[in-house]
Amino acid sequence: MFGHRIVGFYHNQGVILGALVEIYKIKQGSGDTDAVHFLQQARAIADAAITMLVNENGILTEPCEADNGCDGNGTQFKGIFMRNLGYLCRTLREKNKDSSFYGRYQQFIVKNADSIWANNRNSQNQFGLKWAGPVDAVDASRQSSALDAFNAAIPFGSLS
């Protein structure tokens, strides 16, 4: 990240979210009073990502979607992000029952999972890359990415 502009792909933000949550848990378990700093960093990254890396309706949109230029790795990046955003959200919910600490992420996860189900599913319940729809193509990595989003949403209810 440079200032308020995010550079890179979703998996970059997703992997670091998961790592920061793990470091927080290790530090907290050892009694480190500065452990919360790692959650604060994770929240700053998550806040930037869910604000800057979305379309006008708040749905994750990979930069390579515009020209159908995502390779087999790129089609999984959003799923990696959602998996780790879900991990952050569940950790924040466990730490503090006040939904102001996790509610924004919960809503984002559910909104994206619902969009995939409603807008990015074919008649055989296969999923594409464009979570706002329509289905562009189906393959294992697109399916895996969508399933990561659905799994992240399970604790919060989804697929209305």
Regions found by a protein language model. Give the residues of each.
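Intrinsically disordered, low-complexity regions
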Residues: 1-4, 30, 129, 158
